[in-house]
Amino acid sequence: MLESEVSKQITTPLAAPAFPRGPYRFHNREYLNIIYRTDLDALRKIVPEPLELDRAYVRFEMMAMPDTTGLGSYTECGQAIPVKYNGVKGDYLHMMYLDNEPAIAVGRESSAYPKKLGYPKLFVDSDTLVGTLKYGTLPVATATMGYKHEPLDLKEAYAQIARPNFMLKIIQGYDGKPRICELICAENTDITIHGAWTGSARLQLFSHALAPLADLPVLEIVSASHILTDLTLGTPKVVHDYLSVK
């Protein structure tokens, strides 16, 4: 391969890249979202400045993605924390677990999604929408919601999906010193809502050293939503460079 061609490649291995080029379009993406109140002091310890806490809430999200351009079919689970940045409301993505290697690789390399390998599932059990997460063989989370009990306003569903996502991008140099340390923002685009529902929900988190979702304990369920949508991942942008701060 010519030297001029090397920099044109998206990632390694060159003969079989870990993921294809985007954009990444999601068809029939299914969300189970549960917003709950948690411990404010616990949130203060993990949300990085200059983000500001909006309230002592966490959004537990489970996403089934059966048809993703270039990445295939997979399921993802994680926690997002409502925040504000320069007056703009969005969600800080705290941790994400999924069962698809290309999606993990592209999320970490091409953006700043805090993705790790896990085993989430989203399914219907009789009249209940169920989301479960395992890390290795151990249970980490179980979420339940009545299946399509009450319609959710489509504008509200759109607003939930369209919120900006804030993430940390941290890469060390070969000398062990920070090479990249940035706050990133990305938004979903080309959103189409196919259906949305709300209803009663419960969430149980189990302590795990390497999947510490339970460190943000469930004190009260605030709301829940079940949303079917198509969307495209937006291009991430840098909003704050920690290494440029004197």
UniProtKB/Swiss-Prot annotation:
Keyword field contains Zinc: no
Catalytic residue list: K115 (schiff-base intermediate with acetoacetate)
Reaction(s) the record says it catalyses: acetoacetate + H(+) = acetone + CO2
EC number: 4.1.1.4
Gene3D superfamilies: Acetoacetate decarboxylase-like
Signal sequence coordinates: none
Key words of the record: Decarboxylase, Lyase, Schiff base
GO molecular function, one term: acetoacetate decarboxylase activity
Entries under SUPFAM superfamilies matching the protein: Acetoacetate decarboxylase-like
Annotated disulfide bonds: none
Family: Belongs to the ADC family.
Role summary: Catalyzes the conversion of acetoacetate to acetone and carbon dioxide.
Protein name: Acetoacetate decarboxylase
Organism whose genome encodes this protein: Clostridium beijerinckii (strain ATCC 51743 / NCIMB 8052)
Lineage: Bacteria, Bacillati, Bacillota, Clostridia, Eubacteriales
